[in-house]
Amino acid sequence: MPRTYSLSRYILPALLLLFFLSGLILLRKFYVQNTILVPAEGGTYIEGSVGQLQPLMPWFTVKNDVNRDIVSLVFSGLQKYNPSTGKIEDDLATLTVSDNKKIFTIELLENLYWHDSTLESPHPVTADDVIYTFTTIQDEDFSNSLLRQNFLGVEIDKLSDRKVRFSLVEPYRFFASNLTIGLLPDGAFEGVPISKLDQALDFGFNPIGAGPYKFKGMVQTELSTEVTLERFPRMFGDEFHLERAIFRIFPDYTTLLSDIRNLDGVRLVPRNDQGDPIIPKNFTAAQYTLPQYVALFFNVNNPVLQDLKLRLGLQLGTNKQAIVDSINEKIIIDTPLLEIDTSDWRYQFDSNSAQGALFSSDWHLPQKVRLQRALEQREVNAVGALQVEPIAYLATGAALILTGSTLDTDEGSTLNDVLLEPHPSMTGAWIVALPTNGQTGSILPGENLLKLVDSKGNAIDSAYLWRTTNSKSFKRAAEEQRLLAHFIESRDGSVPFEDRITTADLYIEDGMLRRRLSTDPYDIRVNDKGEKLSLRLLTTENPPQYKEIAELIKKHWEPLGVHIGIDVPKTRSKFEEKLIDRDYDILLFGQSLLDNLDSYAYWHSSNMQQFTDKRSDLRIDAYNLSQYSSLEADSLLELIRKSDTDEELQESLDELDEVLKQDVPAIFLYSPLYTFAYVKNLQGVELGSPSLHSDRFLTLQRWF
């Protein structure tokens, strides 16, 4: 007998299960909403980077970002940059600035100690350390010329054990940024010549700072150089949660990836061929930019590049979008202020506008010379007493018959020394038979200038005539005349835009203009002396995308009639030698503006390279790479440094932007995009708006 089941047997258990699950969900929601995630104290952060470790000193990090990362934690400055606000704030000292922005007075915080301090033998940070750090920079033997330049003319005085005064000759709005460099202890380099400080290995590989982390040790493993830092307790500011920070420095990214399971962060993540960051599994990517730009700097010391129309034409002919696409970048810029200006035609890629600007320059395509001459001949023949149409003739007979009006002639007038005769069938007209056999007045093969003269030998008019006996040559000449008419209509705007032609659409073959074919080689522009427009572009091997950009520039400018030779020195030292010598026409290079966008070092004429009979007079710190000189720009750069308010600053920046826009000393291309990767369980990472790669550690106190 079949069994029967009652539905009520299942309803009650199901309701109980549903009630239980709902309770769990509500309990979890309550827990999440009422729980605050509190950072755990301790732990070790291990970061991998690619590079080479050098002595760890704040004075000498400009060329080594890997060093700068470690130095930023071991050493602290009087001031620090806040990537969240973009402002300079107090760090080891409070800062007071006079109303005239010429006196900067710092007062060290209380209870500041160097890392070699012990309970029995504390080593406090004093004004003597401040004096030592900055007066050493001012010494003429100090090898970091860029850093030294920041303190030229600055008077530094000790006011007390904790107070130091910096007195400037001129107001300088951004001077506080110079006080972010890490302090060094007085006496740490006793016996070391100032010129050799960058080689002080004993201190450099066992540094003593006053930063949030102290140097613990360094070991060389099979895969990397490993530097260990330990948290150093300080009596001010936020407490850091991480007990240790370990930096593993690998020779290349492949070796780094082989150790990825032991890393919590990767400093700079490379990209694949599609431009995507190669993010390791279980890592989070944080992308950021720095106040940097990559540009093409025109060496305006070169007389060729003093032609503004030429520089403008090259800018208009540079396809920035194609460049950033090819190297997998994203951020196009048009100005040294890291801006893009889509409203100004001078920044828009337009090959026709580029040709137009170059048309007005001192450099001409060979076809332009022919075009101008042909247009002049056409204009000459279209007016006056002697109007010859067409200009080109296919004449194989013994004479070429021409006719004209007697309105401007008299009896006895001649054309090419051949007497004019009354026309037998046309009233008020003359006729002449010009020989082709070489006799007096003959019309010879090729170009002829006809001269109409009255009976007294006075010139009445002249005209051009081109003669050939070859039908193929005649067709080329006739095609040239057709193109001339089309060019005039294009110039006048009487044909639709898409049907217009420019000089770049023309090509010379056998001395005649024809329409350019895709298979035709590009012509190189020449000047009135017949010199070809050939420029040399200097760049570096690293980063490798610079060479790719250089090849693209060559490709972009070739149709404009500009030949580019690419110069990539094999060594860094050879490149720097050419850089100092200004041994280039165009330089593809990058510059960093740091936290304040102060462009003085890069565009003020005082930072041009000055050439004398002595090579020793050449400056390493001459950062005006375009050799650009402008009284207006100089004045604005000085005003920017002296500005009292943000409004005054922005007004001067806008005016400087306009001056550089008009002068085109460089073509600004893009601002690089970087990627930092860290494990997903690492909390508190906020990059903000860093000015240096190492600025990611300015929020390290929040990491856990």
Segments (PLM) and residue ranges:
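Surface-exposed binding/hinge segments that line
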Residues: N144-P193
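Ligand-site clamp/hinge motif
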Residues: L201, R231-I278, L312, H563-G565
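N-terminal lobe/hinge region of extracytoplasmic solute-binding protein
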Residues: G48-N100, T135, I208-G209
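Aromatic- and charge-enriched surface segment that lines or borders ligand/interaction sites
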Residues: T94-F142, D259, V304-Q306, R311-G313
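Ser/Thr-rich low-complexity repeats and stalk/linker segments
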Residues: L386-K472
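Detector for C-terminal structural segments
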Residues: L21-L24, R28-K29, G317-R346, S353, ...
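Short, well-ordered beta-strand elements
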Residues: E41-Q52, I103-I106, V130-T133, V164-F166, ...
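Gly/Pro-rich hinge or "lid" segments in bacterial periplasmic/extracellular proteins
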Residues: T180-R244, T254-T255, S351-D362, R476-A485, ...
